[in-house]
């Protein structure tokens, strides 16, 4: 591992804005957020995967993985981030290093040769070049190659030196954000600047969720100047330093980006959520309050209240038919980050009982919010293996499991329906109408008549009386 990467990791692990990190002792803080991974054995959840997760939703950028093909293919496009324009981010590019390339030291030459066809064929706004375990171990200088390619062909080539063995996926999120801070943010200036320009950081545009929120901001005259990284363009990231306010959606992943932008450019930030009716309203109010503090027209606050009242009324009217069908249902929520409290709060608004919510990838602030919403910490669940998840579903008598697609088989074994609310989902649930869609999905699952048939005993296990199995009438044959 290079000294530059070691220094960057030490800086990220000592993040003052991270509530989890601030509660650690000096010894634990030095140890880092996770154990170092073994080079070559870090597939899934490694730092490289985290960097890809954070940066791949920038849609007009070519993402080139400098590694053997497996590093590129195993984690490609693992989030259903949507684009309103370019589909370039869905194309995969790799140098496909072979053993001979590695042994003979051809890595840097192969990378340089790979950049030319990508730039000439795709005309990307930029090329992000990712290091992996192999290329970090053999010492390929991505910075030098990217600099030479930028000078030769004009397209910005950004090195993202985040090998998998550097640490956990969460660390990779942060290091990916550091690459943007060091190489992209501030590279371009916007043609016009308004007093109502904002950044949205930590939203990945899953299934187009950002599109459910953007119309609300448009109605208030608020412009999303910078987005990291849902449905973002390279220029949006490059101009993010001119925004007036930053909303941080997932602090566990990119708190370092929001804090450093506040330090360098004086942009205040807050953590909010667009899941649920009340949380969406609160986030809109907070954005407007901070914008007014930064010089936006004061009537923005009144216009925000009018918009919130109108949208809340529409949402509650749309939810009215579903409330009696889902009220009282017991929900086990196994997700992570800010959704551990924001989705729980949204479900409670509709009269559902959250019997448990997971504490994966949460900060101390997230835990405090869960306690505030749930009343105590008895409903908190730490990381659960499938066997434990099955036991929790049964012990807590859950009516539905809200989790990721990989947990659907656990729910099926426990004979309870499941709704996908994690990164693999195909339906957006953000904003006011997103909450309506989520409740519709829950209603569609828990009230499906097939569950009664599934839970009923098999005909051969039923009693040999009544209408299930009866002796045929008529004369004996």
Swiss-Prot record:
The keyword Zinc does not apply. The keyword Ubl conjugation does not apply. It comes from the Bacteria. Pfam families: Oxidored_nitro. One of its GO terms (molecular function) is nitrogenase activity. Pathway: Cofactor biosynthesis; Fe-Mo cofactor biosynthesis. Keywords: Nitrogen fixation. One of its GO terms (biological process) is protein-containing complex assembly. InterPro entries: Nase/OxRdtase_comp1, Nase_comp1_CS, NifE, NifE-like. Disulfide bonds: none annotated. Belongs to the NifD/NifK/NifE/NifN family. This protein may play a role in the biosynthesis of the prosthetic group of nitrogenase (FeMo cofactor). PANTHER family: NITROGENASE IRON-MOLYBDENUM COFACTOR BIOSYNTHESIS PROTEIN NIFE. This is Nitrogenase iron-molybdenum cofactor biosynthesis protein NifE. The gene is nifE.
């Amino acid at each position: 591992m290079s000294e530059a990467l070691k220094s960057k990791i030490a800086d990220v692990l000592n993040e003052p804005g991270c509530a989890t990190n601030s509660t650690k002792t000096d010894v634990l803080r030095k140890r880092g957020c996770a154990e170092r991974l073994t080079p070559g054995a870090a597939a899934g959840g490694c730092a490289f995967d985290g960097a890809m997760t954070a940066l791949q939703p920038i849609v007009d950028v070519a993402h080139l993985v400098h590694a053997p093909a497996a590093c590129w293919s195993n984690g490609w496009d693992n989030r259903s981030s949507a684009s309103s324009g370019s589909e370039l981010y869905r194309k995969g590019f790799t140098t496909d290093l072979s053993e001979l390339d590695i042994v003979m030291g051809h890595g840097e030459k192969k990378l340089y040769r790979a950049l030319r066809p990508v730039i000439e064929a795709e005309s990307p706004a930029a090329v992000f070049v990712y290091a992996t375990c192999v290329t970090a171990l053999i010492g390929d200088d991505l910075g030098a190659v990217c600099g030479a390619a930028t000078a030769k062909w004009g397209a910005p080539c950004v090195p993202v030196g985040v090998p998998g063995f550097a640490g956990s996926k969460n660390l990779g999120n942060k290091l990916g954000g550091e690459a943007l801070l060091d190489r992209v943010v501030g590279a371009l200036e916007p043609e016009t600047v308004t007093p109502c320009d904002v950044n949205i950081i930590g939203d990945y545009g899953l299934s187009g969720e950002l599109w459910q929120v953007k119309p609300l901001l448009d109605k208030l005259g608020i412009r999303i100047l910078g987005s990291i990284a849902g449905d973002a363009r390279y220029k949006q990231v490059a101009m993010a330093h001119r925004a007036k306010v930053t909303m941080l959606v997932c602090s566990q992943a990119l708190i370092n980006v929001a804090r450093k932008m506040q330090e360098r450019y004086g942009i205040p930030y807050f953590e909010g959520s667009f899941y649920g009716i009340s949380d969406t309203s609160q986030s809109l109010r907070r954005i407007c309050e901070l914008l007014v503090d930064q010089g936006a027209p004061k009537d923005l606050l009144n216009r925000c209240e009018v918009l919130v009242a109108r949208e809340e009324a529409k949402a509650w009217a749309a939810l009215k038919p579903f409330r009696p069908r889902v009220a009282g249902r017991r929900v086990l929520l196994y997700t992570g980050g800010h959704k551990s409290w924001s989705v729980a709060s949204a479900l409670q608004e509709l009269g559902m009982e959250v019997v448990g919510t997971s504490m994966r990838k949460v900060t101390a602030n997230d835990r405090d919010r869960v306690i505030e919403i749930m009343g105590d910490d008895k409903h908190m669940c730490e990381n659960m293996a499938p066997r434990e998840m099955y036991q929790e579903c049964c012990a807590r008598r859950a009516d539905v499991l809200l989790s990721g697609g990989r947990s659907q088989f656990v729910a099926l074994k426990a004979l309870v329906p499941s709704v996908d609310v994690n990164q693999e989902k195909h339906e957006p649930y953000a904003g006011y109408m997103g909450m309506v869609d989520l409740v519709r999905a829950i209603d569609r699952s828990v009230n499906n008549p097939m569950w009664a048939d599934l839970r009923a005993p098999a005909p051969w296990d039923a009693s040999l009386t009544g209408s299930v199995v009866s002796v045929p009438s008529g004369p004996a044959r």
